[in-house]
A protein has these predicted regions:
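Glycine-aromatic micro-motifs
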Residues: 1-108
């Protein structure tokens, strides 16, 4: 299995190309992906939660730099609203370990 420390699975507003470009300041490479065992929910913002038999369809942003991460963390309000966690997603090229933003326990 591949492990991409410079990759982020997205499932909400960051699915939109214009939003991604506005946040990181440049175009980024993406691939389609699925996260098994989580479902997408919405309160004030989109978030995902563990759920048996669920699947979240999204994308993986590839090749993120430390500056990209700084901007993304600020956008996602880490650590107040979200925290980064490692997950395994399914892509057309097989499984991939990457990061995802999960809600903090007291946010939802």
């Amino acid at each position: 299995m591949k492990h991409a420390r410079d990759a982020l699975f997205v499932y909400g507003s960051l699915l939109e190309e214009a939003t991604r470009e506005r946040i990181v300041g440049h175009r980024v490479a993406v691939i389609e992906a699925r996260l098994i065992g989580f479902e997408r929910r919405r309160a004030r913002y989109h978030y995902i939660a563990r759920a048996d038999g669920a699947e979240t369809v999204g994308m993986v942003i590839l090749g993120l730099t430390s500056e990209d991460w700084r901007r993304l963390d600020a956008y996602e309000e880490v650590p107040r609203l979200y925290t980064r966690a490692e997950v395994e997603v399914v892509t057309s090229g097989g499984p991939l370990r990457c990061w995802v933003y999960l809600p903090t326990p007291n946010w939802t």
